[in-house]
Amino acid sequence: MRLAIIIGSVRQGRFGPTAAAWLHARACRRDDLDVDVIDLAEAWLPTVLPAGFPARGVTGPPAVEHLRPWLADADAFVIVTPEYNHSFPASLKNAIDWYHEEWRGKPVAFVAYGEASGGLRAVEQLHPVFGALDAVCVGEPVSLPFHRIPPDSSAERLLDALEKHHRDRQR
C-alpha cells in the first residue's frame, strides 16, 4: 500500500515535521507500506482557487499539478495536523480544496498535536470535510498533547487500520 503522510501546517517552528518523522520511521519498518511524506510548506499551493475548480479536465496552477500525482498515487493518507484556535490550519484546508478525485474512497487517518486537547478538536472538524469528498476516516486518531510522542503501538494501530481498510477495499 502506498501511504502519503501529509504535514498540514506551514507555520515556522511547527511540530508537524517531528510528528511526521516519528510516524514515517514506524511506517518504514513495515514491508506492506511504501511511504511518501508531503510537506505543505514545500508545496507552495496558491491560496486563491478559480471559480468552479476543481472541475474534471481543468488543469490547475503548476504547484497544484505537481502535487496531484503524489495524491493520486496514494492508497491512503495520514494527515499530521496541529490544532490552532480549536481547528485545523488554513494551509491544510487549502490543500484539501485543490483536489477532489484524489481523496475519493481512500482511507484517511490522523496524527494531531496541540496543547491539552492534543489536536483532537482539529480532527473532529476534519471528519466532515473529508466525508464531503467521499474519503473514509478510519481508526482512532493519534493524539500528541503538549507535543509528547506516544508509544509506538499508537502508530501501529493507526497503520493497521489504514492497511485493513485498503485491503477490504481491494476485495
Features from the language model and the residues they span:
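Glycine-rich nucleotide phosphate-binding loop and flanking beta-alpha elements
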Residues: 85-86, 117
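Short, glycine-/small-residue-rich phosphate/pyrophosphate-handling segment
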Residues: 104-146, 151-153
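N-terminal beta1-alpha1-beta2 submodule of the flavodoxin-like/Rossmannoid cofactor-binding fold
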Residues: 1-81, 87-94, 99, 153-171
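Short, proline-centered helix/strand-breaking motifs
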Residues: 81-82, 107
